[in-house]
Amino acid sequence: SSGTRTVTIADITDFHGHIERGADNATAFTVADSHNPGNMIPVSTGDLVGGSPYESAVEKDQPTLDMAKAWGLTISAIGNHEFDRGVADFNNRIADPSNGIDWLCANASAANKSPDGLLSHVRDSTIRTVNGKRIGFVGALTDALGSVATPQITRDADLDERAVDAINRVARELKRSGKVDAVVALLHADASAAADIGRDVDVVYTGHSHAIKHGTTAGGAPIYEAGSFGRNMAVQDLIITGAGRRATVRVADVDLGNGTSHTAVDGVLGVDGLNAHPAQAAWMSAGAEENDEVSRAQHIYQASATYANHTGSAVIGTLASGVNFDKQGSDKHGNTVGVLVADANRESIMKHVYAGNRLPVIGFSNNGSLRTPRLDMNGDGKVTVRE
């Protein structure tokens, strides 16, 4: 279409399997769609899975993938936590086409994304045609993968180009080919890493640092980072005039209306307890409970919670009265639950060390990746599989 049309983008990032918030996110996506009916595209900027609560982790995050399908989410950048169980597990299971998501990572080597590569289900970009406009999506993974993943994962992922350079390259190819009318970048890195993205990108969504941020690229495009754990969502309208190489794009923040808890960053909204805008009252009069996406999300969580309660309730240890392991203190300087994890890692290694070994054996933990505030969450002195 050569006229002016509006396409809405709704982005989440670093969801990390928090399916307990899945229904809130389903509501937010459907309200975003009711703002521009049939013309909303939900996206993720990575770490959709991995580092997850027990309800999702115990089933290897399949409930989260099912939740994403319920939302209608079909596009995501790869985050480092997608590789938590290895690159092969990501490619063969998480990125299996049956889950319905196009996973994007333009800075992974072309050879790795070939049919015989370790990331054969990954691509540089994908295109959606909505409301008569063609939207190109380009994804990339943080250049700091080596500092947050094991050497084996870093080798298997084979990132051979700077993330921003890869985004600029693919965006330029898309724009100059005339195949798209707008380009959206999904960069799994802190918002500051997107500063050098060029003029061929119209809007950038970032993640990884779990922050809520806004910025501007060197090319003048807005940058958004929408927090983590399903608490927030960035929603923007792309107002597109013309087509192909002659298209112009204006980006406008969307207010989802009453009940939205606004953050300090324009364009990034809280999704807990979201109600509809008065103009959307007719849609809401049917009740969110009757909405397919919301009811499916609720069912997925309820089924997963039931299974998690069954598998996670067994008591595997006890704590003396008044003793607990918690995450108080600094991620950089340690805390008692982190020391416990390091000790447990050492004990696990010691089971495989031959009796005559004279070398020191050291256990490590990454305090920044600990997701629980304390070991004995309910204070009953019993440690369960779930805890």
Q: Where would I find each of the regions flagged by the language model?
A:
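Acidic, metal/ion-coordinating pockets
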Residues: S2-H262, T336-A344
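Solvent-exposed loop/linker segments at secondary-structure transitions
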Residues: T13-G17, G50-Y54, K175, A193-I197, ...
